[in-house]
Amino acid sequence: MEVFLVLFLQKKNILMRIFVCEFVTGGGFAGAPIPAGLRAEGEMMLRALLADLAAVPGVRLRVCRDARLAAFSVPAETVAVEADAFWDIMRAEIAAAEAFWPIAPESDGILLRLSAMARGKILLGSSPEAVRLCTSKTATARHLAAHGVPTAPALAPGIAAPHGAIVKPDDGAGAEGVRFFADPAAALATARGTQGLIAQPFIAGAPESLSLLCNAGEATLLSCNRQIIARLGDEFHYRGFVVGGAEEKRALYTPLAAAIARAIPDLFGYVGVDLIAASSGPVVLEINPRLTTSYAVLGEALGVNPAAMVLALAAGGVSPPAVSARPVTLALP
């Protein structure tokens, strides 16, 4: 398939100036301390993406970099971002590029704002409309449930929560801000007492994720992943993941991926799905309309260039044939 993608892109005569913004390392925290864990994950995703894009003939890259961080060797022109200059630089760089690939959290509307700035450009990510929906876990769950996709319900009086409950930000990313409550009533009271928090029953099962390639209501399932999450007291912490670590469930997850893409047809390019493999079947927790940390080793797991797949879709190509992933483990700091 790698040869097919290269030949397709060469046939299309791709000559594309792409601006890549990884929010955490790219100046989004300029003027504020950069959380070490987020920085490490951002670096992993960014390096993998730039290497993949640079391998595509005809692509020229620019990337933003927080001016406080050491220069790093990447196949791209680097734009230093000083404090308070981030959004001005985004506007200028997006305007000068042909295509824009944002890597940013949904929280605080950051990914939505960046995606909306790409109007009139090739956005190598999901549309602002899809990002807006997926930013809210509550809105996403309701939307998916209405389309027959199994999701975690909102906690309410009368909703069964035999394993306890969790409280988390409605627009949070990953395990950030997620707390466990043995008493569902206490979880509900906490969520109702703080704006922006939601409560859900704790779903017992294995934490897993999917890496998808989406376009026009269709999805190619790239990899089925196992997440390594530790619960310390009432908090949850990501310790790493095994991309391709749940490939034995591909037959189960392929129709789920298709259902998600049909439910949110504006999803485009790489999309991550967090879920719980419960005894009753998979339960979707959230949709990430952006790169997730799994991307850092996705190409290694697939033996194919995932970014080339996205560019092929953007150039009018059809979705690639079915793929499979071998297990690749990545530990997080």
For the regions a protein language model found, what residue spans apply to each?
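Subset of Sec-pathway N-terminal targeting signals
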Residues: 1-15
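ATP-dependent carboxylate/phosphate-activation module, predominantly the ATP-grasp catalytic core
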Residues: 201-265, 270, 277, 288-314, ...
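Nucleotide-activated donor-dependent transferases that construct or modify glycoconjugates
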Residues: 16-38
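Structural motif
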Residues: 17-19, 98-99, 224
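Conserved N-proximal alpha/beta basic substrate-recognition cap immediately N-terminal to
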Residues: 52-53, 60-154
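Conserved protein kinase catalytic/activation segment
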Residues: 281-283
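Short catalytic helix/loop segments, enriched in acidic residues and glycine
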Residues: 33-53
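Active-site nucleotide/adenylate-binding loops and adjacent lid/helix of ATP-dependent enzymes
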Residues: 128-207, 214-222, 239-258
